[in-house]
Amino acid sequence: MLCCMRICVCGDEGTGKSSLITSLVKGVFVTNKIQPILPQITIPPTIGTPENVTTTTVVDTSAVPQERSNLAREIRKSNVILLVYSDHYSYERVALFWLPYFRSLGVNVPVVLCANKSDLAADHTETQVIEDEMLPLMSEFKEIDSCIRTSAREHRNVNEAFFLCQKAVTHPIAPLFDAKESALKPAAVAALQRIFYLSDKDRDGYLSDKEIKDFQMRCFEKPLSEEDLVHIKETIQKTHPDSVTPSGIDCRGFIHLNKMYAEKGRHETVWIILRAFQYTDSLSLQESYLHPKFEVPPFASAELSPEGYRFFVNLFLLSDKDNDGGLNDAELASLFAPTPGLPPSWADGSFPSCTVRNEAGHVTLQGWLAQWSMTTFTSPKTTLEYLAYLGFESSDRSNPSTTAALKVTRPRKRRKRPGRVGRNVVLGHIVGAPGSGKSALLDAFLSRGFSTTYHPTIQPRTAVNTVELPGGKQCYLIMDELGELEPAILENQAKLLDQCDVIVYTYDSSDPDSFAYIPALRAKYPHLEELPSVYIALKADLDRTTQRAEHQPHEYTALLNMPGPPLHVSVTWSSIQEVFVHIAEAAMEPSTAFPRSEEDVEGKWMSWGIALGAVVCAGAAAVMIWRRVSGSGV
């Protein structure tokens, strides 16, 4: 909110500056002699004062040379300048002296041009003055926001002149309209195009009558009458007859309507629309709207809330114009039209190849939701930013922010404690020797075909998909191959333990030198022991070979007291999907993927001993019975 607006009244001597101020304060023309420079006055808000103005300070100035330093100081302190002229000479001085002088001071404030003493120019009509005097100046000097004819003697348009000054600050024309080109500026057009897109709820390219009425309520908080609706359509049809159809008003007509508002001095209407959609004076979205406060505690994570998932589901369904169950390039481009484009992290992650696609290569609904689940997990601020760009509206009155689309999971500090973690999105890092099959594992995760060509992974690669757990519950599993960043990621202990839910160790069971990479890696980064782990022997369709390592894989995992030996699997087998379930379960129930404690091992040996004892006893009893039966038969 603007706590105090300063209006600096400038102009040649004798143009009636002080009389205008006095007439504003008194409400009538003062015939008595007025002092050369009035002291500054502060006026409270009145009816018609913009809502975000609390008080207005009006400063009188003198044009005499000895007051030039005071004049410059007041101009620099002002929010708007009311430049007054009253005859041909003072009018000529507007372009020759005053406006160049303002520019020389380096000020960037709007100027309201005021033709005072209109009672003395009865032979000039309003239209003549505007066309002959004001419009040429406005086309030459962009800083002129608006113009008005006044008469302090007749108290004509005095209040309106100062009201225009207030409006020039709260609803400036300069960011919206180029008077010289007689066109809306590109930034204004872009903002209005986004507003049209968000108001077109069914994405058919037209604002229907209902959508226009909903738009009216959102922006102006009052209903639109049928007569006003008809008038709007007729106004557009006069210059753009093709923009009004039975389906509604198209974007071209909507932009033209706002251009007309700006041309006719009704740019306040345009600003009301822009601010209803969270735009600032610089035509950027408000920072607090794009980046609301949202904290994720250590060992917790961010996920989409049910309302967030609903929003992205509806957005997908609206954007899938051909109803083929996938978003093609054109549909994605249309969907992201009100945004700066794809999130940078998506481009870096080779979207859409990192998520689920159909046979045509188009992102499916499953892949779309998985991608946003991953984005929210890794960068909740990105999701919040794009929720704002895409027009998310919270249904929660207690939380109207975009943060209503997200939720924070409970921190998981003690992963070795039995039980599930309270999250639906988990992250697993895949590590292993070069050529062990990590990339093929990611391809299989996304149901991609197996390729026999080996391409070493340089840049990190990520894949995300849903996994159905035993019992029918689903979770989103993010898996990434670290590439050249593996050392940097693994040595950052704090970040690794905070973000990673499971570490997946892979080796090529047909390569004798593959497994040795894993013990060496764990020795180099001992904090990996604090993460749940899954060991996978890939390429099981090939001949298994003895590993050149201190311990064979099954011996190594046994020495660690892991719950079981490495999983043997091939990405060419249909059973590969069970591996992803196993990985997801290890992340969701981390206690099952840690080395067993001595108590667990002793308990297992005891249960084996009891079972073995029972078998021995049963066998001995059977022998005794057989002997007795045999003896009785002799």
From Swiss-Prot:
GO terms, molecular function: calcium ion binding; GTP binding; GTPase activity
Region (Disordered), start-end ranges: 399-419
Keywords on record: Calcium, GTP-binding, Hydrolase, Membrane, Metal-binding, Mitochondrion, Mitochondrion outer membrane, Nucleotide-binding, Repeat, Transmembrane, Transmembrane helix
Basic residues: bias regions: 409-419
GO terms for biological process, alphabetical: heme transport; mitochondrion inheritance; mitochondrion organization; mitochondrion-endoplasmic reticulum membrane tethering; phospholipid homeostasis; regulation of mitochondrion organization
Parts of the chain on the Mitochondrial intermembrane side: 626-634
Residues reported to bind Ca(2+) 2: 320, 322, 324, 331
Subcellular location: Mitochondrion outer membrane
Domain EF-hand stretches: 187-222, 307-342
EC number: 3.6.5.-
Family recorded in the similarity comment: Belongs to the mitochondrial Rho GTPase family.
Function text: Mitochondrial GTPase involved in mitochondrial trafficking. Probably involved in control of anterograde transport of mitochondria and their subcellular distribution.
Protein's UniProt name: Mitochondrial Rho GTPase 1
Species this protein is from: Emericella nidulans (strain FGSC A4 / ATCC 38163 / CBS 112.46 / NRRL 194 / M139)
